[in-house]
Amino acid sequence: MKGIILHGGHGTRLRPLTHTGPKQLLPIANKPMSQYCLESLKEADITEIAIIVGGIGSNKVKEYYGDGSKFGVNLTYIEQDSPKGIAHAISLCRDFIDNEKFIVFLGDNIINTSIRTFKNNFVDGDFDASL
């Protein structure tokens, strides 16, 4: 099982806060929004994670998360050259996913509960997708 965190978009509705970086790095309770996504995946024993980056501040995302080791995960960065939607971003992960099941997080969404049961039901289930 692998994880994908979408970290794209321009964050225009949050300007001027997003003039210099992505909205997913804006802090909520002293940590970036997308860190909650990463921690949810790790808590569910998903440690192979791709972060889709693109637009302003991609380098800041890479600087903050690095290779993922300080969070106990392995990170792969995948560039999305222009915002073409969620389906396009996920399609860029084809090689990373390598026919495994995967969970997608939008980097600016915070789920304040464990995803472990959801993940286990998906892994054990005989279906292609779960929402």
Provide a role label for each language-model segment.
Residues H19-Q24:
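Short alpha-helical oligomerization interface
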Residues T113-L131:
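Conserved donor-nucleotide/metal-binding helix-loop-beta segment in metal-dependent transferases, i.e.
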Residues K2-I5, R13, P27, K31-L106, ...:
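Conserved N-terminal catalytic core of the sugar/cofactor nucleotidyltransferase
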